[in-house]
Swiss-Prot record:
Claim: Lipoprotein is one of the keywords in the record: no
Protein name: Guanylate kinase
Species whose genome carries this gene: Neisseria meningitidis serogroup B (strain ATCC BAA-335 / MC58)
Family note: Belongs to the guanylate kinase family.
Primary location class: cytoplasm
Length: 205
């Protein structure tokens, strides 16, 4: 966290099964000054997921009440479940100088970029569709029909990667994490993100 600058907002998107969640977890564990935005969802928790840590798990009625209050930067219905990013928490973290990660889908990323043009978009690519299919099958949580739908959707999502600022291929977890760290560090060093430090330096010269 820096006392001199507003934090960056990083949008990290990927097709389902690309390893985005694992990469983000590793990045948060090994990189200081980063916070993740905890999304709201109406889907049931998976094994090992905790409310308020991985997601805010809410009912459909609660989610739709938040929509009516315009509480989300973005939200979407994904395979019958709502997902959304709360605006208040993201803005508070960035204002405090933290870099904020939004781990959201392509549709949500477009909504956030419209609302926050300064946000940095990063898209995670699988090394191949064969690897992606194997990862989805390996989860053991979805039917064959759902997996085929996810693969079909993945092709469309990967086509949308041209709208992002950076792409990272997750063929090796450690290397992909290192690529993400380089992106975060480079964005922190942008002149536009160091104006507070520069002004303070000149004032005290």
């Amino acid at each position: 966290m820096s006392a001199y600058r507003k934090g960056n907002i990083f949008i990290i998107s990927a097709a389902s099964g690309t390893g985005k969640t694992t990469l983000v977890s590793r990045l948060l564990a090994n990189h200081n000054g980063l916070r993740v935005s905890v999304s709201h969802t109406t889907r049931p928790p998976r094994e090992g997921e905790a409310n308020g840590v991985h997601y805010h798990f809410v009912s459909k009625e609660e989610f739709e009440s938040l929509i009516a209050q315009e509480a989300f930067l973005e939200y979407a219905d994904v395979f019958g479940n709502y997902y959304g990013t709360g605006a208040e928490g993201v803005n508070a973290l960035a204002a405090a100088g933290y870099d904020v990660i939004l781990e959201i889908d392509v549709q949500g990323a477009a909504q956030v970029r419209d609302a926050l043009p300064e946000a940095v978009g990063i898209f995670i690519l699988p090394p191949s569709f064969d690897v992606l299919a194997a990862r989805l099958n390996g989860r053991g949580t979805d039917s064959r029909e759902v997996i085929q739908r996810r693969l079909s959707k993945a092709r469309h999502e990967i086509e949308q990667s041209v709208l992002f600022d950076f792409v990272v291929v997750n063929d090796d977890l450690a290397r992909a994490e290192e690529d993400l760290r380089h992106i975060v560090n480079a964005c922190r060093l942008k002149r536009s993100r160091q104006l507070g430090f520069i002004a303070d330096l000149l004032e005290n010269s």
